A protein has these predicted regions:
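Canonical positions in the second alpha-helix
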Residues: 20-21, 54-55, 88-89
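Residue-level recognition of tetratricopeptide repeat
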Residues: 28, 62, 96-97
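Structural marker of alpha-solenoid helical repeat scaffolds
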Residues: 24, 58-59, 91-95
Length: 130
């Protein structure tokens, strides 16, 4: 159900279907990865990272989870952490690993722009006479 919704471009319905499947099969790595991929496609990298990390807790050598986590990190602008995932992938399956290709390409691209937060901006104090 989730795959069909995702194939038709309805990521919201896919996420709902995968979340329902997760209640039936809690801890299922394949469902977690599908849910993580769908949430990442929807632009919810933080939520995707959570699902990738739960999948990695269940299967620490899962190449798809390491790749997905790295892609989500790169999309958030955390290229240093994403680079660690690339090194980990290359250690697991060698320099010519097909799984590291999307992550290597994402890291080669320009990093995502940093989000502006209230703490990263300082207001200029302007004092004027009345």
């Amino acid at each position: 159900e989730g795959q069909a919704a995702l194939a038709s471009g309805n990521t919201g319905a896919a996420i709902d279907a995968y979340e329902s499947a997760l209640t039936v099969e809690p801890g299922s790595v394949s469902v977690l990865l599908a849910l993580a991929d769908a949430t990442r496609q929807e632009g919810m990298q933080g939520k995707a990272l959570h699902y990738y990390r739960v999948a990695l807790a269940n299967d620490p050598r899962n190449v798809a989870a390491i790749t997905g986590e790295g892609l989500a990190l790169a999309e958030k602008g955390a290229t240093e952490k994403a680079g660690r995932n690339l090194v980990r992938l290359q250690a697991l399956c060698g320099k010519d690993c097909a799984a590291d290709s999307p992550l290597a390409e994402a890291l080669a691209r320009k990093p995502a722009p940093k989000m502006v937060t209230a703490t990263s901006v300082t207001a200029k104090t302007l004092i004027s006479e009345n």
